[in-house]
């Protein structure tokens, strides 16, 4: 998708939840995209960040920006793809200092404003994103096999609000969850 976007003259914003993950992904992307890749995050000095900002405003902006939350605020002249890797991570939430925001939500809004596509990546999507996929608001691509062929978990969405309204819950856990935990423990499995 990144290569296709670049070939069509578009720009890509690739967001990671933590700066520590940047180095690993950067090496892979640098091998493919070379000097078309720009890295942007809060650990860079002010001077380094200003240089990236200036290049984004130039006639030769980066085709791909890889970064953490702060990369959302860079200028893009032709943003066409936004990738939010590990979208479920809580570190996408900016608490302090203000402004407080959720980078995943901000990325979706930025993409909407720019007419860009959004790819939310996660092997364990947030409940919000998974619900949006189940209701058709988002598309869903499922991983059918896991690393070393580990069995995929069965996911069951339970409307606990409805269960509470019908007085079918005595605590914070649904009857289905309690039954599954009891069954796992009875079989000697982890729960």
Give, region by region, the residue ranges found by the protein language model.
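SF2 helicase catalytic motif II
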Residues: 56-64, 69-119
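Glycine-centered short loops/turns at secondary-structure junctions
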Residues: 9-10, 60, 115, 188
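Conserved motor-coupling elements within RecA-like helicase/translocase cores
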Residues: 27-65, 73-79
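Conserved Walker A/P-loop ATP-binding site and its immediately adjacent core
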Residues: 5-31, 48
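Switch/connector loops and helix/strand junctions flanking conserved nucleotide-binding motifs
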Residues: 22-24, 47-50, 74-75, 90-93, ...
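Motif I (Walker A/P-loop) of helicase-class P-loop NTPases
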Residues: 1-3, 26, 107
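Flexible beta-alpha connector loops of hexameric P-loop NTPases
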Residues: 37-46, 89-101, 163-171
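Conserved interdomain linker/interface between the two RecA-like ATPase lobes of SF2 helicase motors
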Residues: 106-191
